[in-house]
């Protein structure tokens, strides 16, 4: 979960992936849980009666949905225990170190720095303290103390907790800042002396040295005299297209920073700081997100091609009419088009997103099979008995839970009687305490006033209500493939081989 102090090439790649996607979520989770009083409201494991989520929410004065989004992650991280009856208690090691007054005070002091960390770029350029919330903060000195000095903790578990609580988000914002300054791109071209880096990035002497020292601590850079470069491990990991993709990932994560800072407000009152139900916010956010998805189009294309091949095992795609709802980059619809040249694919999304999808479809020579349909996911009537296959590629997680029945009703109506609904989604286990990456993804959906992730049985119940009584859930790399149809329609029970193996 938290990044190691030094990394081999493979673990450095994993660490960078975590810092780009979930490190700030981890810090915000722990920071908010402490500020809510959630840890204090839980009985210690084995010393009291476990409490359910709704009772815990009432105890801390927060929404049930908000508290659940925190608790499911805390259980997965093994900081909170959940018994077979779904009762919750605080694990003994956590209860022990949170009783340490000095350690707890250190956590509370660290929690105050979130807003100031967001001004790191300004601090690097000026070399001076920055103003945040009417106060002056020496962010550069804070980074030096946080990463380059030893922070005492009463137990190894406490030190690990502090690392997640304080350093995870700080790592993310350091790399956001290094990306915005152009520092990482400068180092990617080869060793650079300090004067050249300052000239290229606009950094002050103090600011640049602080950033380079912390990057070195993370295993990314090395300095000899006045010359800095990527470490060999970092050079290998960030070679080719990896660095541009990483920078785009950090750009997406940066959009959540203020919302994570004010997460307590959202958990208590469901007051959403980054509200993707706001049309203007949504349009801007998803336009950027479609560009990010396009950056990993090749890997997503492998997944979607495998899904199309899986369905083709039991149902011919020849002449099929396919609707790709919330198409994003267009990768799922294109997979069906490329699997069967006679299939006709309709790509449905916001107009601003379809512009990028059209470019991708054209690039993969599937434009002749394509139709582009701009519209509103939340209200659109998709027709009646019009499609052999309807694809929902990571779309359901943007819908609030109360919106899912209507969505499934509209989709089921649009399916032909023997049609198949294809859902690509992060599906939770039946206890809703994993997988970890899925839970972090769901955490961000709550943060932005979107939807919940569900288990297979939860999806199956909703689909059965609209007549899609047959379901299977197959594991793809990174996500799940959920297929649904009416009774009597044959569904595949195992994945087709990966495209290369199939060839």
Where are the model-predicted features located?
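Alpha-helical subdomain
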Residues: 2-84, 93, 101, 156-223, ...
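Conserved Class I S-adenosyl-L-methionine-dependent methyltransferase catalytic core
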Residues: 18-33, 40, 68-195, 199-200, ...
